[in-house]
Amino acid sequence: MNESNMENEKTPLYVAFSTQKGGVGKTTFTVLAASYLYYLKGYDVAVVDCDYPQHSIAGMRKRDAEQVGADEDYKRMAYEQFTRLGKKAYPVLCSSPEKAIATADKHIAAGHVPDIVFFDLPGTVNSEGVINSLAGMDYIFTPISADKVVLESSLSFAVAIHKLLVKNETCRLAGLYLFWNMVDGREKTDLYTAYDKTIKELELPLMKTFIPDTKRYKKELVADRKAVFRSTLFPASRPLVRGSNLEELITEIVYYIKLQ
């Protein structure tokens, strides 16, 4: 079978990190997962930035490109990486919640067939556009934190999506998985045990991997530091990945979405 026929038979997976609450790391995880899978693991990736009008990931790509253009070390890193990989940076497509799926479909129809498309959707799920886009996903991953208000909001979102979309056989959505984010090591005791019990009672799948509360998840490319963590042009640097549980999280995600 020739390669072009195989390309045509490949069905891209549509995946979103999504929850009702802002500030829980949806955009960060989208970028980290996309960059890790594309630059390190060799998967073909596209990102649809639906966070209208901010378009945070498109803004990050612009800042990353400017930083690389202005810094000799980053310029060398980029040249070496893209020469070795033999491909350009993954595309970041600007869209809106209403047009998210159409944007991805159009990109694919034009002959760009990635293995996986990540969608960065806004936190408000009270609009029809966001609900329709979530219904068009294959998998949703929801970061949760032990803050009571955030957790209650995230769980009510997850329960609603699970009931309305995952259990609805007419919808594309095959699964929604929760994972703990911003875990304070000192608190990973009775509080989390109690919350885990509640999540189990709600019959929501909880991932094994948890993400520790560490400042590195907030770091972008900066001129005076060559170690990279959150970037659309590079994967996270090995020294910064250590202890972040990022690799474990993405390995578990790959397992759940059955990425070949």
Show which residues each predicted segment covers:
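Inter-motif core of Ras-like GTPase G domains
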Residues: 129-148
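Inter-lobe coupling/hinge region of RecA-like P-loop helicase motors
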Residues: 218-250
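Glycine-rich phosphate-binding loop used to anchor ATP phosphates in small-molecule kinases
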Residues: 112-129
